[in-house]
Protein backbone atom coordinates (compact mmCIF):
# COMPACT_ATOMS: atom_id res chain seq x y z
CA UNK A 1 0.00 0.00 0.00
CA UNK A 2 2.85 2.38 0.81
CA UNK A 3 4.35 1.95 -2.64
CA UNK A 4 0.99 2.61 -4.29
CA UNK A 5 0.50 5.80 -2.32
CA UNK A 6 3.99 7.14 -2.95
CA UNK A 7 3.47 6.85 -6.69
CA UNK A 8 0.33 8.98 -6.36
CA UNK A 9 1.53 11.39 -3.68
CA UNK A 10 1.88 14.36 -6.04
CA UNK A 11 -1.71 14.16 -7.24
CA UNK A 12 -4.28 16.73 -6.16
CA UNK A 13 -6.58 15.34 -3.44
CA UNK A 14 -9.42 15.48 -5.97
CA UNK A 15 -7.51 13.31 -8.44
CA UNK A 16 -6.29 11.03 -5.65
CA UNK A 17 -9.94 10.56 -4.73
CA UNK A 18 -10.51 8.56 -7.92
CA UNK A 19 -7.80 6.08 -6.89
CA UNK A 20 -9.28 5.82 -3.40
CA UNK A 21 -12.72 5.18 -4.90
CA UNK A 22 -11.32 2.30 -6.97
CA UNK A 23 -9.92 0.69 -3.85
CA UNK A 24 -13.00 1.38 -1.72
CA UNK A 25 -15.23 -0.13 -4.45
CA UNK A 26 -13.14 -3.27 -4.89
CA UNK A 27 -15.28 -5.36 -2.52
CA UNK A 28 -18.60 -5.95 -4.26
CA UNK A 29 -20.21 -7.17 -1.03
CA UNK A 30 -19.58 -3.89 0.79
CA UNK A 31 -21.13 -0.44 0.44
CA UNK A 32 -18.66 2.19 -0.73
CA UNK A 33 -19.10 5.51 1.10
CA UNK A 34 -17.50 8.48 -0.65
CA UNK A 35 -17.17 11.32 1.86
CA UNK A 36 -14.45 12.88 -0.25
CA UNK A 37 -16.40 15.33 -2.37
CA UNK A 38 -18.32 18.41 -1.28
CA UNK A 39 -21.20 18.14 -3.75
CA UNK A 40 -24.29 18.38 -1.49
CA UNK A 41 -27.11 15.86 -1.64
CA UNK A 42 -29.66 18.57 -0.81
CA UNK A 43 -30.96 21.38 -3.01
CA UNK A 44 -33.43 24.26 -3.10
CA UNK A 45 -36.58 23.13 -4.92
CA UNK A 46 -38.82 26.21 -4.73
CA UNK A 47 -36.69 28.50 -6.93
CA UNK A 48 -36.28 25.63 -9.38
CA UNK A 49 -40.03 25.12 -9.61
CA UNK A 50 -40.31 28.85 -10.23
CA UNK A 51 -37.70 28.64 -12.98
CA UNK A 52 -39.61 25.98 -14.88
CA UNK A 53 -42.98 27.72 -14.44
CA UNK A 54 -41.43 30.99 -15.58
CA UNK A 55 -40.20 29.16 -18.66
CA UNK A 56 -43.75 28.16 -19.58
CA UNK A 57 -44.93 31.76 -19.22
CA UNK A 58 -41.98 32.95 -21.30
CA UNK A 59 -42.75 30.49 -24.10
CA UNK A 60 -46.33 31.77 -24.20
CA UNK A 61 -45.04 35.35 -24.32
CA UNK A 62 -42.83 34.45 -27.26
CA UNK A 63 -45.78 32.97 -29.12
CA UNK A 64 -47.65 36.29 -28.99
CA UNK A 65 -45.40 37.24 -31.91
CA UNK A 66 -45.59 35.32 -35.19
CA UNK A 67 -48.69 33.61 -33.82
CA UNK A 68 -49.65 32.58 -37.35
CA UNK A 69 -46.56 30.32 -37.32
CA UNK A 70 -46.96 28.78 -33.88
CA UNK A 71 -48.24 25.54 -35.40
CA UNK A 72 -44.67 24.88 -36.54
CA UNK A 73 -43.15 26.11 -33.27
CA UNK A 74 -42.00 29.61 -34.23
CA UNK A 75 -42.17 32.42 -31.71
CA UNK A 76 -40.75 35.93 -31.48
CA UNK A 77 -39.06 38.18 -28.96
CA UNK A 78 -41.02 39.03 -25.83
CA UNK A 79 -42.67 42.46 -25.67
CA UNK A 80 -42.54 44.61 -22.54
CA UNK A 81 -45.84 46.41 -23.25
CA UNK A 82 -48.56 44.87 -21.08
CA UNK A 83 -46.29 42.15 -19.69
CA UNK A 84 -47.13 42.88 -16.06
CA UNK A 85 -50.86 42.42 -16.63
CA UNK A 86 -50.36 39.20 -18.59
CA UNK A 87 -48.07 37.86 -15.86
CA UNK A 88 -50.59 38.65 -13.11
CA UNK A 89 -53.25 36.75 -15.08
CA UNK A 90 -50.85 33.82 -15.37
CA UNK A 91 -50.31 33.92 -11.60
CA UNK A 92 -54.05 34.05 -10.89
CA UNK A 93 -54.80 31.15 -13.23
CA UNK A 94 -52.02 28.93 -11.82
CA UNK A 95 -51.92 29.98 -8.17
CA UNK A 96 -52.23 26.37 -7.00
CA UNK A 97 -48.73 25.68 -8.34
CA UNK A 98 -45.97 26.24 -5.76
CA UNK A 99 -43.49 27.66 -8.24
CA UNK A 100 -46.10 30.09 -9.55
CA UNK A 101 -46.89 31.34 -6.04
CA UNK A 102 -43.20 32.05 -5.56
CA UNK A 103 -43.11 34.00 -8.83
CA UNK A 104 -46.01 36.13 -7.65
CA UNK A 105 -44.22 36.90 -4.39
CA UNK A 106 -41.03 37.67 -6.30
CA UNK A 107 -42.78 40.28 -8.41
CA UNK A 108 -44.16 41.89 -5.26
CA UNK A 109 -40.74 41.86 -3.56
CA UNK A 110 -38.96 43.34 -6.57
CA UNK A 111 -41.57 46.09 -6.88
CA UNK A 112 -42.38 46.84 -3.23
CA UNK A 113 -39.11 46.06 -1.43
CA UNK A 114 -36.37 46.68 -3.98
CA UNK A 115 -38.18 49.49 -5.79
CA UNK A 116 -37.46 48.09 -9.26
CA UNK A 117 -39.66 48.50 -12.32
CA UNK A 118 -41.84 45.35 -12.35
CA UNK A 119 -42.31 45.35 -16.12
CA UNK A 120 -38.57 45.72 -16.72
CA UNK A 121 -37.93 42.89 -14.25
CA UNK A 122 -40.41 40.58 -15.96
CA UNK A 123 -39.11 41.41 -19.41
CA UNK A 124 -35.51 40.67 -18.36
CA UNK A 125 -36.56 37.38 -16.75
CA UNK A 126 -38.64 36.30 -19.75
CA UNK A 127 -36.05 37.34 -22.31
CA UNK A 128 -33.33 35.77 -20.18
CA UNK A 129 -34.98 32.41 -19.63
CA UNK A 130 -35.72 32.12 -23.35
CA UNK A 131 -32.01 32.69 -24.01
CA UNK A 132 -32.85 34.53 -27.21
CA UNK A 133 -30.46 37.47 -26.81
CA UNK A 134 -26.80 37.94 -25.94
CA UNK A 135 -26.13 38.93 -22.32
CA UNK A 136 -26.24 42.75 -22.26
CA UNK A 137 -24.34 44.19 -20.48
CA UNK A 138 -21.80 41.38 -20.78
CA UNK A 139 -20.75 41.75 -17.14
CA UNK A 140 -24.28 41.02 -15.85
CA UNK A 141 -27.89 41.75 -16.74
CA UNK A 142 -28.95 45.04 -15.14
CA UNK A 143 -31.85 43.97 -12.93
CA UNK A 144 -30.35 40.58 -12.13
CA UNK A 145 -27.25 42.38 -10.85
CA UNK A 146 -29.36 44.56 -8.54
CA UNK A 147 -31.15 41.52 -7.11
CA UNK A 148 -28.07 39.35 -6.68
CA UNK A 149 -26.15 42.29 -5.21
CA UNK A 150 -28.75 42.62 -2.43
CA UNK A 151 -28.33 38.92 -1.66
CA UNK A 152 -24.53 39.14 -1.64
CA UNK A 153 -24.44 42.20 0.60
CA UNK A 154 -26.81 40.59 3.10
CA UNK A 155 -25.17 37.17 3.23
CA UNK A 156 -21.61 38.53 3.36
CA UNK A 157 -22.40 40.77 6.33
CA UNK A 158 -21.70 43.86 4.23
CA UNK A 159 -24.78 45.92 5.11
CA UNK A 160 -22.59 48.98 5.80
CA UNK A 161 -21.55 49.13 2.13
CA UNK A 162 -23.87 51.16 -0.15
CA UNK A 163 -25.24 48.68 -2.67
CA UNK A 164 -24.63 50.96 -5.65
CA UNK A 165 -20.90 50.99 -4.86
CA UNK A 166 -20.58 47.26 -5.63
CA UNK A 167 -20.16 45.84 -9.14
CA UNK A 168 -20.81 42.18 -9.98
CA UNK A 169 -19.50 39.98 -12.77
CA UNK A 170 -21.68 36.89 -13.31
CA UNK A 171 -19.51 33.84 -13.98
CA UNK A 172 -19.73 30.08 -14.48
CA UNK A 173 -19.28 29.29 -10.78
CA UNK A 174 -16.34 29.81 -8.46
CA UNK A 175 -14.12 27.71 -10.72
CA UNK A 176 -14.42 30.17 -13.61
CA UNK A 177 -14.05 33.12 -11.23
CA UNK A 178 -10.71 31.81 -9.97
CA UNK A 179 -9.41 31.10 -13.47
CA UNK A 180 -10.48 34.52 -14.78
CA UNK A 181 -9.01 36.43 -11.83
CA UNK A 182 -5.61 34.73 -11.89
CA UNK A 183 -5.33 35.27 -15.64
CA UNK A 184 -6.37 38.93 -15.56
CA UNK A 185 -4.03 39.69 -12.66
CA UNK A 186 -1.19 38.32 -14.78
CA UNK A 187 -2.25 39.90 -18.09
CA UNK A 188 -2.59 43.33 -16.47
CA UNK A 189 0.77 43.20 -14.73
CA UNK A 190 -0.66 43.11 -11.21
CA UNK A 191 1.02 39.77 -10.57
CA UNK A 192 4.34 38.89 -12.16
CA UNK A 193 6.51 35.78 -12.03
CA UNK A 194 8.39 35.69 -8.74
CA UNK A 195 5.89 37.86 -6.86
CA UNK A 196 4.95 36.75 -3.36
CA UNK A 197 1.37 35.66 -2.72
CA UNK A 198 0.06 34.86 0.75
CA UNK A 199 -2.30 31.89 1.02
CA UNK A 200 -4.44 31.07 4.05
CA UNK A 201 -3.74 27.42 4.91
CA UNK A 202 -5.22 24.82 4.88
CA UNK A 203 -7.03 25.74 1.71
CA UNK A 204 -8.92 24.47 -1.32
CA UNK A 205 -6.11 22.80 -3.27
CA UNK A 206 -6.25 24.85 -6.52
CA UNK A 207 -5.24 27.96 -4.57
CA UNK A 208 -1.98 26.14 -3.86
CA UNK A 209 -1.59 24.58 -7.30
CA UNK A 210 -2.47 27.51 -9.61
CA UNK A 211 0.28 29.90 -8.39
CA UNK A 212 2.82 27.10 -8.89
CA UNK A 213 1.99 26.72 -12.59
CA UNK A 214 4.76 27.83 -14.94
CA UNK A 215 2.52 30.48 -16.49
CA UNK A 216 2.32 32.26 -13.10
CA UNK A 217 5.47 31.09 -11.21
CA UNK A 218 4.49 32.88 -8.01
CA UNK A 219 6.23 32.50 -4.66
CA UNK A 220 3.83 31.23 -2.01
CA UNK A 221 3.83 32.42 1.60
CA UNK A 222 1.70 30.25 3.89
CA UNK A 223 -0.55 31.95 6.43
CA UNK A 224 -1.12 28.93 8.65
CA UNK A 225 -4.25 28.43 10.72
CA UNK A 226 -3.56 26.82 14.10
CA UNK A 227 -5.56 23.70 15.03
CA UNK A 228 -4.99 24.48 18.72
CA UNK A 229 -6.82 27.78 18.13
CA UNK A 230 -9.75 25.99 16.48
CA UNK A 231 -8.21 26.67 13.07
CA UNK A 232 -8.00 30.44 13.45
CA UNK A 233 -5.02 32.39 12.09
CA UNK A 234 -2.65 33.48 14.90
CA UNK A 235 -1.72 37.16 14.91
CA UNK A 236 1.87 36.17 14.15
CA UNK A 237 0.74 34.50 10.91
CA UNK A 238 -1.50 37.36 9.81
CA UNK A 239 1.33 39.78 10.53
CA UNK A 240 3.19 38.24 7.58
CA UNK A 241 0.84 40.35 5.46
CA UNK A 242 2.74 43.45 6.60
CA UNK A 243 5.56 42.43 4.25
CA UNK A 244 5.34 44.88 1.32
CA UNK A 245 6.71 42.17 -0.98
CA UNK A 246 3.43 40.25 -0.62
CA UNK A 247 1.17 41.43 -3.42
CA UNK A 248 -2.06 39.59 -2.66
CA UNK A 249 -3.67 37.47 0.05
CA UNK A 250 -5.76 34.48 -1.10
CA UNK A 251 -8.12 32.90 1.40
CA UNK A 252 -11.21 30.72 1.60
CA UNK A 253 -13.55 31.92 4.32
CA UNK A 254 -15.06 29.87 5.89
CA UNK A 255 -12.10 27.61 5.36
CA UNK A 256 -11.90 24.39 3.38
CA UNK A 257 -11.26 21.82 4.79
CA UNK A 258 -11.33 22.98 8.47
CA UNK A 259 -14.76 24.56 7.79
CA UNK A 260 -14.31 27.46 10.20
CA UNK A 261 -15.07 31.13 9.60
CA UNK A 262 -12.52 33.81 10.47
CA UNK A 263 -13.33 35.14 13.92
CA UNK A 264 -13.74 38.82 14.73
CA UNK A 265 -10.19 39.07 16.09
CA UNK A 266 -8.75 37.85 12.78
CA UNK A 267 -10.95 40.14 10.71
CA UNK A 268 -9.98 43.15 12.81
CA UNK A 269 -6.31 42.18 12.58
CA UNK A 270 -6.49 42.17 8.79
CA UNK A 271 -8.39 45.47 8.82
CA UNK A 272 -5.70 47.08 10.96
CA UNK A 273 -2.87 45.67 8.84
CA UNK A 274 -4.49 47.12 5.73
CA UNK A 275 -5.22 50.47 7.37
CA UNK A 276 -1.87 50.97 9.08
CA UNK A 277 0.67 49.01 7.04
CA UNK A 278 -0.67 47.73 3.71
CA UNK A 279 -3.27 50.01 2.11
CA UNK A 280 -2.07 48.58 -1.23
CA UNK A 281 -2.65 44.91 -0.28
CA UNK A 282 -4.89 43.04 -2.73
CA UNK A 283 -7.17 40.40 -1.20
CA UNK A 284 -9.06 37.60 -2.92
CA UNK A 285 -11.62 35.87 -0.70
CA UNK A 286 -13.66 32.83 -1.74
CA UNK A 287 -16.72 32.78 0.51
CA UNK A 288 -18.83 29.97 -0.93
CA UNK A 289 -19.45 28.47 2.54
CA UNK A 290 -20.35 31.77 4.20
CA UNK A 291 -24.07 31.06 4.00
CA UNK A 292 -23.63 28.03 6.30
CA UNK A 293 -21.98 30.10 9.06
CA UNK A 294 -23.63 31.86 11.98
CA UNK A 295 -23.34 35.67 11.80
CA UNK A 296 -20.91 35.52 8.91
CA UNK A 297 -18.84 38.51 7.86
CA UNK A 298 -16.60 38.51 4.81
CA UNK A 299 -13.27 40.23 4.37
CA UNK A 300 -15.11 42.07 1.60
CA UNK A 301 -17.27 43.65 4.32
CA UNK A 302 -14.19 44.55 6.39
CA UNK A 303 -11.85 45.75 3.63
CA UNK A 304 -14.13 46.35 0.63
CA UNK A 305 -11.72 48.56 -1.32
CA UNK A 306 -8.94 45.96 -1.07
CA UNK A 307 -10.97 42.83 -1.73
CA UNK A 308 -12.30 40.87 -4.66
CA UNK A 309 -15.08 38.59 -3.46
CA UNK A 310 -15.83 35.27 -5.15
CA UNK A 311 -19.17 33.69 -4.31
CA UNK A 312 -20.69 30.56 -5.81
CA UNK A 313 -24.32 29.43 -5.53
CA UNK A 314 -23.23 25.80 -5.85
CA UNK A 315 -23.21 24.54 -2.27
CA UNK A 316 -26.00 26.48 -0.54
CA UNK A 317 -28.58 25.89 -3.26
CA UNK A 318 -27.30 22.46 -4.35
CA UNK A 319 -26.42 23.85 -7.76
CA UNK A 320 -22.95 22.57 -8.66
CA UNK A 321 -24.21 21.58 -12.10
CA UNK A 322 -25.70 25.01 -12.79
CA UNK A 323 -22.27 26.72 -12.66
CA UNK A 324 -23.43 29.95 -11.01
CA UNK A 325 -21.22 32.50 -9.31
CA UNK A 326 -20.21 36.13 -9.10
CA UNK A 327 -17.10 38.23 -8.64
CA UNK A 328 -17.82 41.35 -6.56
CA UNK A 329 -15.66 44.48 -6.56
CA UNK A 330 -16.04 47.84 -4.86
CA UNK A 331 -16.14 50.72 -7.32
CA UNK A 332 -13.15 52.31 -5.55
CA UNK A 333 -10.55 49.57 -5.25
CA UNK A 334 -6.81 48.92 -5.04
CA UNK A 335 -6.86 46.82 -8.21
CA UNK A 336 -7.77 49.89 -10.25
CA UNK A 337 -5.23 51.98 -8.31
CA UNK A 338 -2.54 49.40 -9.06
CA UNK A 339 -3.37 49.65 -12.77
CA UNK A 340 -2.88 53.42 -12.55
CA UNK A 341 0.55 52.94 -10.94
CA UNK A 342 1.93 50.65 -13.65
CA UNK A 343 4.97 51.74 -15.63
CA UNK A 344 4.15 53.78 -18.73
CA UNK A 345 5.50 51.02 -20.98
CA UNK A 346 3.08 48.55 -19.37
CA UNK A 347 0.19 50.98 -19.78
CA UNK A 348 1.01 51.39 -23.47
CA UNK A 349 0.96 47.61 -23.94
CA UNK A 350 -2.42 47.41 -22.20
CA UNK A 351 -3.71 50.31 -24.31
CA UNK A 352 -2.97 48.13 -27.31
CA UNK A 353 -4.58 45.03 -25.75
CA UNK A 354 -7.91 46.70 -24.98
CA UNK A 355 -7.95 49.31 -27.76
CA UNK A 356 -11.00 47.77 -29.47
CA UNK A 357 -13.22 48.28 -26.40
CA UNK A 358 -13.16 52.05 -25.81
CA UNK A 359 -11.07 55.12 -26.70
CA UNK A 360 -9.79 55.74 -23.15
CA UNK A 361 -8.43 52.32 -22.23
CA UNK A 362 -6.92 53.61 -19.00
CA UNK A 363 -10.37 54.29 -17.58
CA UNK A 364 -11.29 50.60 -18.00
CA UNK A 365 -11.86 49.08 -14.56
CA UNK A 366 -10.24 45.83 -13.52
CA UNK A 367 -13.61 44.05 -13.25
CA UNK A 368 -14.42 45.04 -16.85
CA UNK A 369 -11.00 43.77 -17.92
CA UNK A 370 -11.96 40.48 -16.28
CA UNK A 371 -14.99 40.32 -18.56
CA UNK A 372 -12.97 41.12 -21.68
CA UNK A 373 -10.13 38.75 -20.78
CA UNK A 374 -12.63 35.94 -20.22
CA UNK A 375 -13.36 36.08 -23.96
CA UNK A 376 -9.89 36.95 -25.30
CA UNK A 377 -10.89 40.67 -25.52
CA UNK A 378 -11.89 40.44 -29.19
CA UNK A 379 -15.05 38.55 -28.24
CA UNK A 380 -16.01 40.92 -25.44
CA UNK A 381 -19.22 41.86 -27.28
CA UNK A 382 -20.46 38.27 -26.91
CA UNK A 383 -19.08 37.73 -23.39
CA UNK A 384 -21.19 37.04 -20.35
CA UNK A 385 -22.85 34.23 -18.45
CA UNK A 386 -25.76 32.67 -20.33
CA UNK A 387 -29.00 34.49 -19.61
CA UNK A 388 -30.95 31.42 -18.34
CA UNK A 389 -28.17 30.92 -15.77
CA UNK A 390 -28.52 34.53 -14.68
CA UNK A 391 -32.28 34.09 -14.30
CA UNK A 392 -31.82 31.06 -12.05
CA UNK A 393 -29.25 33.02 -10.05
CA UNK A 394 -31.73 35.86 -9.57
CA UNK A 395 -34.44 33.41 -8.47
CA UNK A 396 -32.07 31.76 -5.97
CA UNK A 397 -31.25 35.21 -4.59
CA UNK A 398 -34.92 36.19 -4.31
CA UNK A 399 -35.65 32.90 -2.55
CA UNK A 400 -33.08 33.73 0.13
CA UNK A 401 -34.00 37.41 0.38
CA UNK A 402 -37.69 36.68 0.90
CA UNK A 403 -36.93 34.03 3.54
CA UNK A 404 -36.64 36.65 6.26
CA UNK A 405 -36.77 34.04 9.04
CA UNK A 406 -33.94 32.08 7.35
CA UNK A 407 -35.92 28.84 7.58
CA UNK A 408 -34.07 27.27 4.64
CA UNK A 409 -30.70 28.24 6.14
CA UNK A 410 -31.54 26.90 9.61
CA UNK A 411 -32.76 23.62 8.11
CA UNK A 412 -29.51 23.06 6.22
CA UNK A 413 -27.38 23.97 9.24
CA UNK A 414 -29.28 21.50 11.42
CA UNK A 415 -28.95 18.83 8.75
CA UNK A 416 -25.17 18.97 8.42
CA UNK A 417 -24.59 19.40 12.16
CA UNK A 418 -26.67 16.32 12.95
CA UNK A 419 -24.51 14.41 10.50
CA UNK A 420 -21.34 15.57 12.25
CA UNK A 421 -22.73 14.65 15.67
CA UNK A 422 -23.64 11.19 14.37
CA UNK A 423 -20.20 10.55 12.86
CA UNK A 424 -18.29 11.48 16.00
CA UNK A 425 -20.75 9.72 18.32
CA UNK A 426 -20.14 6.43 16.51
CA UNK A 427 -16.41 7.14 16.53
CA UNK A 428 -16.66 7.43 20.31
CA UNK A 429 -15.85 11.11 20.57
CA UNK A 430 -17.83 14.28 21.28
CA UNK A 431 -18.54 16.44 18.20
CA UNK A 432 -16.23 19.37 17.60
CA UNK A 433 -18.22 22.38 18.79
CA UNK A 434 -17.02 25.94 18.16
CA UNK A 435 -18.99 29.14 17.61
CA UNK A 436 -17.04 29.78 14.39
CA UNK A 437 -17.48 26.25 13.01
CA UNK A 438 -19.50 25.85 9.83
CA UNK A 439 -19.44 22.02 9.72
CA UNK A 440 -19.77 21.64 5.96
CA UNK A 441 -16.61 19.53 6.21
CA UNK A 442 -14.87 17.96 9.14
CA UNK A 443 -11.12 17.49 9.25
CA UNK A 444 -10.64 14.22 11.11
CA UNK A 445 -7.29 14.66 12.86
CA UNK A 446 -5.99 11.09 12.96
CA UNK A 447 -3.35 11.88 15.59
CA UNK A 448 -5.84 13.64 17.83
CA UNK A 449 -8.49 10.93 17.44
CA UNK A 450 -6.13 8.08 18.30
CA UNK A 451 -4.76 10.02 21.28
CA UNK A 452 -8.22 10.67 22.70
CA UNK A 453 -9.29 7.07 22.20
CA UNK A 454 -6.24 5.25 23.53
CA UNK A 455 -3.63 7.74 24.76
CA UNK A 456 -0.62 9.63 23.46
CA UNK A 457 1.73 6.63 23.35
CA UNK A 458 -0.58 4.73 21.03
CA UNK A 459 -1.16 7.84 18.92
CA UNK A 460 2.57 8.33 18.39
CA UNK A 461 2.96 4.66 17.46
CA UNK A 462 0.05 4.75 15.01
CA UNK A 463 1.36 7.86 13.23
CA UNK A 464 4.82 6.32 12.90
CA UNK A 465 3.43 3.12 11.41
CA UNK A 466 2.35 4.73 8.17
CA UNK A 467 1.92 8.07 6.45
CA UNK A 468 -1.45 9.79 6.36
CA UNK A 469 -1.81 8.77 2.72
CA UNK A 470 -1.10 5.15 3.52
CA UNK A 471 -3.65 5.33 6.32
CA UNK A 472 -6.33 6.73 3.99
CA UNK A 473 -5.63 3.97 1.46
CA UNK A 474 -5.95 1.43 4.26
CA UNK A 475 -9.23 3.02 5.38
CA UNK A 476 -10.51 2.79 1.80
CA UNK A 477 -9.31 -0.80 1.42
CA UNK A 478 -10.59 -2.14 4.74
CA UNK A 479 -13.75 -0.10 5.27
CA UNK A 480 -14.84 1.14 1.82
CA UNK A 481 -14.72 4.76 3.04
CA UNK A 482 -13.16 7.55 0.97
CA UNK A 483 -11.62 10.50 2.79
CA UNK A 484 -9.31 13.10 1.25
CA UNK A 485 -5.84 13.74 2.74
CA UNK A 486 -5.67 16.94 4.78
CA UNK A 487 -2.04 17.38 3.78
CA UNK A 488 -3.12 17.88 0.18
CA UNK A 489 -4.97 21.02 1.33
CA UNK A 490 -1.88 22.39 3.06
CA UNK A 491 -2.60 21.00 6.53
CA UNK A 492 0.46 20.05 8.56
CA UNK A 493 -1.51 17.56 10.66
CA UNK A 494 -2.13 13.90 9.72
CA UNK A 495 -5.79 14.13 8.83
CA UNK A 496 -8.58 13.18 6.47
CA UNK A 497 -11.29 15.49 5.13
CA UNK A 498 -14.86 14.25 5.20
CA UNK A 499 -17.68 16.19 3.60
CA UNK A 500 -20.79 16.37 5.77
CA UNK A 501 -22.94 17.43 2.84
CA UNK A 502 -23.07 14.52 0.43
CA UNK A 503 -24.19 11.43 2.37
CA UNK A 504 -27.14 10.53 4.59
CA UNK A 505 -27.07 10.41 8.37
CA UNK A 506 -27.00 6.61 8.62
CA UNK A 507 -24.02 6.58 6.27
CA UNK A 508 -22.09 8.96 8.54
CA UNK A 509 -22.92 6.60 11.40
CA UNK A 510 -21.39 3.78 9.35
CA UNK A 511 -18.28 5.88 8.72
CA UNK A 512 -17.89 6.56 12.44
CA UNK A 513 -18.30 2.88 13.34
CA UNK A 514 -15.87 1.73 10.64
CA UNK A 515 -13.20 4.21 11.72
CA UNK A 516 -13.64 3.20 15.37
CA UNK A 517 -13.37 -0.48 14.45
CA UNK A 518 -10.17 0.21 12.57
CA UNK A 519 -8.76 2.18 15.52
CA UNK A 520 -9.63 -0.72 17.85
CA UNK A 521 -7.81 -3.16 15.56
CA UNK A 522 -4.76 -0.91 15.43
CA UNK A 523 -4.77 -0.67 19.21
CA UNK A 524 -4.96 -4.45 19.51
CA UNK A 525 -1.94 -4.68 17.19
CA UNK A 526 -0.11 -2.07 19.27
CA UNK A 527 -0.97 -3.84 22.54
CA UNK A 528 0.27 -7.15 21.17
CA UNK A 529 3.59 -5.62 20.18
CA UNK A 530 3.93 -3.94 23.59
CA UNK A 531 3.40 -7.27 25.39
CA UNK A 532 6.13 -8.90 23.32
CA UNK A 533 8.72 -6.27 24.26
Swiss-Prot record:
Annotated GO biological process:
alanine biosynthetic process; aspartate metabolic process
Residues recorded as bearing N6-(pyridoxal phosphate)lysine in the entry: 315
* PROSITE patterns to which the protein is assigned, alphabetical: AA_TRANSFER_CLASS_1
Q: Which residues bind L-aspartate?
A: 115, 256, 497
Pfam families xref list: Aminotran_1_2
What this protein catalyses is: L-aspartate + H(+) = L-alanine + CO2; L-aspartate + 2-oxoglutarate = oxaloacetate + L-glutamate
Documented applications: Is highly specific for L-aspartic acid, and so can be used to produce L-alanine and D-aspartic acid from DL-aspartic acid.
By its UniProt entry, which PANTHER family does this protein fall under?
A: ASPARTATE AMINOTRANSFERASE (PTHR46383:SF1)
Biological role stated in the UniProt entry: Bifunctional enzyme that has both L-aspartate decarboxylase and transaminase activity.
This chain's protein is named: Bifunctional aspartate aminotransferase and L-aspartate beta-decarboxylase
Organismal lineage? Bacteria, Pseudomonadati, Pseudomonadota, Betaproteobacteria, Burkholderiales
Gene this protein is translated from: asD
Amino acid sequence: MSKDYQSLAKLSPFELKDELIKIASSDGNRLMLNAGRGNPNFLATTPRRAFFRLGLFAAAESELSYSYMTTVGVGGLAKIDGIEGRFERYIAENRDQEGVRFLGKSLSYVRDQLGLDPAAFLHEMVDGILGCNYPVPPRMLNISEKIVRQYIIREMGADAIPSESVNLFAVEGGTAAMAYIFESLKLNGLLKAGDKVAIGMPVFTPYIEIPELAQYALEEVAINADPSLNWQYPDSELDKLKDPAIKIFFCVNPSNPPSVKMDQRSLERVRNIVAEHRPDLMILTDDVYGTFADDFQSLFAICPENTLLVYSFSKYFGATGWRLGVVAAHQQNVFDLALDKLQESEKVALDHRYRSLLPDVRSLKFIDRLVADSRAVALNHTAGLSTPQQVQMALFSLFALMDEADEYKHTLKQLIRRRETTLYRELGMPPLRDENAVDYYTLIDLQDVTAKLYGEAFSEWAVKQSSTGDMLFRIADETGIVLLPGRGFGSNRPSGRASLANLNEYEYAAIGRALRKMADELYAEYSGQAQNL
